[in-house]
Curated annotation (Swiss-Prot):
Keywords: Disulfide bond, Protease inhibitor, Thiol protease inhibitor, Vacuole. Disulfide bonds join C8-C60, C109-C115. It is found in: Vacuole. It comes from the Eukaryota. Its main location: other. It comes from Solanum tuberosum (Potato). This is Cysteine protease inhibitor 3. GO terms for molecular function: cysteine-type endopeptidase inhibitor activity. One of its GO terms (cellular component) is vacuole.
Length: 146
């Protein structure tokens, strides 16, 4: 989403499952760090880089990988292979209203620091993804194969 009329939009927003609000979520690809992880399945706590799977301009083609900026906001502009742009997926004990037990949380896990949950915060009126210090504070994610 383009906040601030940037040449390459870099905001990563939380998709709200409310009709008419921010449209549909955008598909992502999980790029595994290790070549030993084969197949289509990304296992929990595997080191991954998260990359939007969207059409983009030639100018912005390198602006699709997620990272955390100095304000602790999740933005694009990361690089696959950069140890600071590592994320992990962790299973939670939550259950969806429909009864699914496949509810996860995302962690940002730069190599030189411990992992932090990805939570939410409204910044300038937008539901932004941010790192949070409280282990119980996180946004639950449900993944749908695109």
């Amino acid at each position: 989403y383009n906040i601030g009329n940037l040449q390459c939009p870099n905001a990563v927003l939380q998709h709200m499952s409310i009709p008419q609000f921010l449209g549909e979520g955008k598909p992502v690809v999980f790029v595994r760090k290790s070549e030993s992880d084969y197949g289509d399945v990304v296992r929990v706590m595997t080191v991954v880089y998260i990359k939007f799977f969207v059409k983009t301009t030639k100018l912005c083609v390198d602006q699709t990988v997620w990272k955390v900026n100095d304000e602790q906001l999740v933005v694009t502009g990361g690089k696959v292979g950069n140890e600071n742009d590592i994320f992990k997926i962790m299973k939670t004990d939550l259950v969806t209203p429909g009864g699914s037990k496949y509810v996860y949380k995302l962690l940002h896990c730069p190599s030189h620091l411990g992992c932090k949950n990805i939570g939410g915060n409204f910044k300038n009126g937008y539901p932004r993804l941010v790192t949070v210090d409280d282990d119980k504070d996180f946004i639950p994610f449900v993944f749908i194969k695109a």
